[in-house]
Amino acid sequence: MKPTTFAIRGTVCFSTDSQNLTCLENAFIVCQDGRTAGVFPELPAQFEGIPVEDVGDQLIIPGMNDLHLHAPQYAFHGMYMDLELLEWLNQVTFPEEARYADLSYAEKAYSIFAEDLRQSATTRASIFATLHVEATELLMDLMEKTGLKTYIGKVNMDRNGTADLQEKSAVVSAGDTVRWLTDTAGKYENVKPILTPRFTPSCTDELMNALAELQRTYRLPVQSHLSENQSEIAWVHELCPNTSFYGEAYDQFGLFGSPDCPAIMAHCVYSSEAEIALMKKRGVFVAHCPQSNTNLSSGIAPVRRYLEEDLHIGLGTDIAGGHSLSMLRAIADAIQVSKLRWRLVDDSLKPLSLEEAFYMATMGGGAFFGKVGTFLEGYEFDALILDDRGLRHPQPLTARERLERLIYLSDDRCITGKYVSGNKIF
């Protein structure tokens, strides 16, 4: 039987809020029944005799929470980066996602994705599948086995797709969604369903009404896209002339989040003042996707503004608009693009600090999953052990310096251990 209480000793780094990063060398972090019991300079007497894993000088940090990625697109990540969003969807993404009607192809592709995500810095994620029920259930089966905690959504789209990737009607789309929810109810320990209208241009009002009814019935969170690209925003305005901004296209159906059933909205590059106010009112989680926003020439989201407004905000890799599964890379990308926005767009919004971007990847995005993303007492014990011995330096570095260097210079090969809710993944 696995021990319900154990400790790991090493150099521990974690956020306490968006501005503060705690770093403790030679510290003990105690996990009890899957949650953090505390971080201590010495092991308290009450925990005397528990198993202790000593990782030496390696870094111990919270697991990363990826708020936005597309599993079927992993098959072409790192390719076709010379297109903007709408062209990229029609020429590359939709044809690839159509292949997942073939379960043998889906199994090959999703098996690669699931294993690579297991080996990555990500411990929790909110994932788009495709509109295919069977392939989505296959992805859920594979992700369950990884031990990672994920939300996975069967995509809904009944317009503006392609002949091979579009549901026949709102009735068919809603019916398939009910079948998927029924098939998977109570089946998983690690995987949960999330309603996934692809984005407003892909969903008729009839479908959005049906999804709103399902949301109320099943009490499910929602994930979608918001204000990613200027052409997309103009298209939404044409499709929904009764709305004054993109977010209202979701909110009019009750699909823009609530305190007990939050919504993740990816990108939010061009959100208006009114949209930001509604996002704050509804408790929307912004999934900032800096790499994708760069690759698809979408723009740079005003993340500093969202932090100042105290919006919920985390990071997303947005595979395959983003080319890397690494959430460490996403942290560095978020900092870098914020500097460009400050220099080129709006010098009133200062760049992100390391503390802020690290918080977004851990505690900020982790809040979507509950008490997740830090080593404060009572939070679920999701952890990474990072070995930076391959990065040589002529003099000793502080723990913060080592963490920053790993974020900028490492890849996932530096990860020597991974825990989710106290369970050791590797």
Where are the regions that the model predicts?
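Divalent metal-coordination and catalytic microenvironments
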Residues: 11, 29, 34, 57, ...
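N-terminal metal-binding scaffold of metallo-dependent hydrolase/deaminase domains
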Residues: 1-47
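Alpha-helical scaffold segments that flank or form the walls of functional sites
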Residues: 30, 77-148, 173-187
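His/Asp/Glu-enriched, well-ordered alpha-helical/loop segment
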Residues: 245, 252-259, 304-392
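C-terminal cap of metal-dependent C-N hydrolases
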Residues: 15-17, 380-426
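Active-site gating loops and adjacent loop-to-helix segments of metal-dependent hydrolytic enzymes
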Residues: 77-108, 159-171, 229-260, 333-352
